[in-house]
């Protein structure tokens, strides 16, 4: 298939550029892409790439934000592994975005002042109807280990990718079904090893479930990868599974000690399950528990194993990838383009894809990076639900690429 030029794709997608000739015709009123106002009575509950279960609140009149870490593997203090920032909150002020191409887009995007650890990379939130995505405050991680084990190299994350929903499905019977799962995890105590999440998950109404992994240390196995899903006691509306198997081997533990939290957003009449793995570590023996490290953490998305029709998911989506870059994804038929929405003309920052809707597994659209050294061999996978997609590419198996995007227009 001959790939369209980036310029022609851009002109077809108003999020990225304004193209064509002028006109004196009256302009139709701008249709908002998000609520005209928000306050703290609306809470976006969701997951972060850090493995955190988060509540985000915005007040677009007072221009303030608040992030509450309900569950977290991220240490509260650099140089330690516990306690984490679970149960704590951060606050700050908002600035409406001005760097997007149109007012329609800027009025639904905000910078979270004080949230980033790198002033050249602002933390931003993009708001839609019932969904908010972007980034939440980052953290500098470092730990010297215990007797040479569990060392976490010094690294500063300016922010973490996040997606959350204003309405959740809290009845597990309504979540039961078979899903494709795509995501990524990182293991800080293994030099931040990045691991793909690629599996099939079947969830039953009684909380029992099964995961069949296509990658990771459990590739080829089908098993219940944690305790039965139940309502999390933290009151977040999420479901929890204990002793949740990771995609890698724990650094210092005989078995899985991390937890899984499934946040099921309700969006456009569909469920959008986000499954995070929240790792854990203990560096002391004062509690009578020996030191341990099962700090693999991350995020994934689930979507039903239901066939996706060609052209049914066309449109523009916005999100953040696991390289901590903001991404607009324009999908048109069998082609997709990922572009930096703040620098849309920079071709070097873009990624062009060919999509294949054959779907040997229902609901799993494969993709090929145009011009990649892998040629026409599919290295990527897309899943879709409720106007949200998850995209995993393993062109380089040691550094899988992942992003979640939500529909804009």
Predicted ranges, named:
Residues 15-18:
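C-terminal motif of bacterial Sec signal peptides marking the signal peptidase cleavage site
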Residues 1-7:
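Bacterial N-terminal signal peptides that target proteins for export
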